[in-house]
């Protein structure tokens, strides 16, 4: 059966409804058959406050002054801003959010900004929001903010939707599986499959890897294992042992097959495979010996030996 199915099955107990729905939405069709219309800007560095103020110039001072004397922002106000095509930056300033930094999603008025952006961009609100945020925050900073926001009830849904847009942008930019694994702060859990599965970022990451491989389960398994090996002290045996010890048996079996296919693709000798799975000293019929036996058969078939 397909790897992604087992991944989602394993994650179902720990991924909340919105996350599961978001992961489902981010399947292959979202990346391959739908156009990327987020129009995300190339600049991704967290910009220097002074240079931003210099670019905005006098309008910034005026908007700041309006903030000091304005009454409470109402839905009618947001509607007027949207009708007048006010910029996302204008709304952030008027809502006194432009200096919120990494705490933007925790601010009470952030919901007003989301409402304004939805009114202004009813067809692609999340894409427009992400585009605006990416002019203010670098990839790693914004990713960390979204991960934190997904854990808070009030911002979980919007953060999940924004993360979908972020993944689409990364796909367009050509970020690798390792890049996203790192941005999702998963590398510290690469020594335990069970810890990875329990992390809410694992499901979106695997979905991203699946999209990178155009839905091919074999290539997906191989890429997942390659990334795990990179962050598992770069030891193949460490990954094999980790998978063998996992409670997520079907997922572990799929990934061990990915490890098998990686070694076969790289023409690793059977005695090296035997050492990496720890077959020596195990009884006949052990999982390790059966693994090596299957590998020898596949290797000989590949090379017509």
Curated annotation (Swiss-Prot):
Sorted keywords for this record are: Host nucleus, Secreted, Signal, Virulence
Q: Which GO terms describe its cellular component?
A: extracellular region; host cell nucleolus
Query: Which Cys pairs does UniProt list as disulfide-bonded?
Result: none
Motif (RxLR-dEER) spans which residues?
44-56
Q: Report the locations given in the UniProt record.
A: Secreted; Host nucleus; Host nucleus, Host nucleolus
Q: What induces it?
A: Expression is induced during host plant infection.
User: Where would one find the signal peptide in this protein?
Assistant: 1-16
Free-text comment about domains: The RxLR-dEER motif acts to carry the protein into the host cell cytoplasm through binding to cell surface phosphatidylinositol-3-phosphate.
Entry similarity comment: Belongs to the RxLR effector family.
The protein's role, per its UniProt record: Effector that enhances P.infestans colonization of Nicotiana benthamiana leaves.
> What is the designated name of this protein?
RxLR effector protein PexRD25
Q: Which organism is it from?
A: Phytophthora infestans (strain T30-4) (Potato late blight agent)
Taxonomy, top ranks, is: Eukaryota, Sar, Stramenopiles, Oomycota, Peronosporales
């Amino acid at each position: 059966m397909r790897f992604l199915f087992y991944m989602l099955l394993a994650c179902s107990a720990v991924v909340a409804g919105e996350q599961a729905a978001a992961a489902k939405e981010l399947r292959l069709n979202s990346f391959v058959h739908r156009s990327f219309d987020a129009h995300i800007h190339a600049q991704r560095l967290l910009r220097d406050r002074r240079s931003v103020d210099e670019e905005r110039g006098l309008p910034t001072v005026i908007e700041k002054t309006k903030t000091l004397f304005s009454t409470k922002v109402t839905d009618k106000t947001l509607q007027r801003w949207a009708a007048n095509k006010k910029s996302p930056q204008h709304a952030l300033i008027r809502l006194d959010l432009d200096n919120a930094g990494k705490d933007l999603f925790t601010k009470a008025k952030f919901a007003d900004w989301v409402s304004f952006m939805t009114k202004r961009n009813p067809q692609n609100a999340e894409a427009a929001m992400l585009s605006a945020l990416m002019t203010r925050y670098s990839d790693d900073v914004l990713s960390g903010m979204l991960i934190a926001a997904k854990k808070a009830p009030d911002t979980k849904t919007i953060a999940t939707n924004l993360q979908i847009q972020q993944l689409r942008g990364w796909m367009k930019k050509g970020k690798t599986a390792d890049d996203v694994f790192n941005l999702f702060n998963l590398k510290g859990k690469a020594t335990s499959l069970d810890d990875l599965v329990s992390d809410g970022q694992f499901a979106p990451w695997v979905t991203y890897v699946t999209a990178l491989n155009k839905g091919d389960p074999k290539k997906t398994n191989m890429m997942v294992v390659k990334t795990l090996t990179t962050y598992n002290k770069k030891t193949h045996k460490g990954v094999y042992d980790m998978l063998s010890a996992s409670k997520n048996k079907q997922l572990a079996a799929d990934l061990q097959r990915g490890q098998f296919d990686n070694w076969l693709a790289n023409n690793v000798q059977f005695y090296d495979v035997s050492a990496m799975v720890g077959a020596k000293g195990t009884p006949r019929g052990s999982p390790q010996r059966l693994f090596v036996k299957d590998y020898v058969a596949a290797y000989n078939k590949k090379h017509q030996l």
